[in-house]
Amino acid sequence: MTGEVGWVYTLHLHTPLGTTGRNSARHYTGWACEHGLLARLKSHRSTYADAAMMRWCARAGIGWHLSALARGTRADERQAKKHGAARRCWTCQAAA
C-alpha cells in the first residue's frame, strides 16, 4: 500500500560499500510499517536480508547505525531516495 504511513529511515554505513566515488554507497534508505521498524532493522543484520545492499553489508561485516527517522509512506521513501541521504543523515550532518 503506497498510502500506508510507517517509518522512512536512513542507515549510515560505517564503511562505504563498493569501490570509490559514485560507485560506493555510505547510506541505505528504507521503509517499515507502523509496528515493524525494529523487526525490519533486525532483518538488515542478516546475511539473508531482503534488501540486497544490506545483505552485502552483512556478508562483508560492515556495521551500520540508524541515522535518520521520520514518519512517511513508501512514496515518501522513494522521494527521499532521489535526494542525497547525507542531507538527512545525523552522522554526516554532525561531521560537516
Predicted feature locations:
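Major-groove DNA-recognition helix of helix-turn-helix-type DNA-binding domains
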Residues: T47-M53
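GIY-YIG nuclease catalytic motif and its immediate N-terminal context
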Residues: M1-K42, S46, C57-Q79, G84, ...
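Secretory pathway export signals and precursors
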Residues: M53, A85-R88
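Extended, charge-rich low-complexity interaction segments
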Residues: R88-A96
